[in-house]
Amino acid sequence: MALTNIRVCWGQTVSGFAGFALAILVGLSPHALAQPVGARETAPAPKPEHSVSLRWIGAFKIPTGTLFEGVEFGGISGLDRAPNGRYWAISDNRESPRMYALRIDLDQRGLHAVHIEQMVTLRGADGQPLPARTADTEAIRLTADGHLLIASEGHWSVNPGWRHPPFVSSFTTSGSFVRAFGLPPAFGLIDNRTTGARSNKVLESLAVTPGGSVFAAVEGALIDDGPVSTPASGSWLRLIKFDPASGAPAAQYAYALPPIPLPRPSEAGGAMASLASNGLSDLLAVSEDSFIAVERAYVPGQGVTVRLVLTRIGALTTDVSPLPSLSGGTFTPMSRQLLLELAVSAHGQRIDNIEAIAWGPVLANGNRSLVLVSDNNFSRRQTTQFLAWEVVSP
């Protein structure tokens, strides 16, 4: 089996964080590797190098056109695993907002099968199914009360009747609406041109920490925070921390999204590169302040690049809630450390439109596993792709 090695050097600030987060990731005591918070934030003296690895387990595909209870399966944009081993997946189909219960047969030997067990229609506060074109559901996470937190990134249209705002709301596992979380005004679709959020670039990811804290992040930069990423320049994204009891926003943090990676850099000036896109497609909690971010880039004619990034809200990370713009502002962003990059193809798989990440089961040897899933866009040229890795300690 192939090994993707991650090298962690204590002589660099962000790498010191990576060692701390990876210690949690593989189930070690974080104190075994971590330095005091102040030391991590202020360039500690070089220390011995540590490493962990991701061991490739396998892949499984569900073809586009697969039907379940007479409805086409696809558009999977979020995934989370329940304590009983069942997975909940959210579809971004705007005509019929729905989620699925899945069973994923995964062990150290391979990713053997994915079984669709249940389809659940999402319902509004009135108890009726969410109407068509009122939600673009992109992320899903289980909360301690057994409910499912779902994020919709909203949609802007010049036709007011076709507009729908982004939201973060809680639902039961039977699809009933429980409550809505509050969003800062700047995250609304105001005019899609001069201020507010960008259509199809708003809430794409959710994370719930082991202690129950809730986070959501935008896929692309808010208009007031500057342009979106290009092959030549990166951008600033905002991550919201919510008070889980009230559902109100409690803080915001800045995440640095780098320039769009080009699988073939020699074509940087080509027409296809000018149509490239990059965004934060999901977020998985590792601890109370550490996350794995999924960055997904697409360049027409070249393919998809996916990066897994370890990121952390440190003691010196700025709460940017008071800042009307991140463009030219003074603040300390979240730390970031590249964990894994999948460019176009890997392990015999052509990398598809990866939009979801979840913890898999703890394997027989005690190691944790990770699962990534792609959104097939209901396209015959794509599939719903499940990819799995084992997190291996030194």
Task: Label every model-predicted segment.
Residues A2-L3, L28, G279:
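Intrinsic disorder/low-complexity signature
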Residues C9-W10, A18-A21, I292, L387:
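Compositionally biased, low-structure terminal segments
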Residues S15-S29:
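Bacterial N-terminal signal peptides
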Residues W10-F17, A39-T42:
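Intrinsically disordered, low-complexity terminal tails and inter-domain linkers enriched
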Residues M1-G11:
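N-terminal secretory signal peptides that target proteins for export/translocation
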Residues L33-P394:
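Sequence/structural signature of beta-propeller domains
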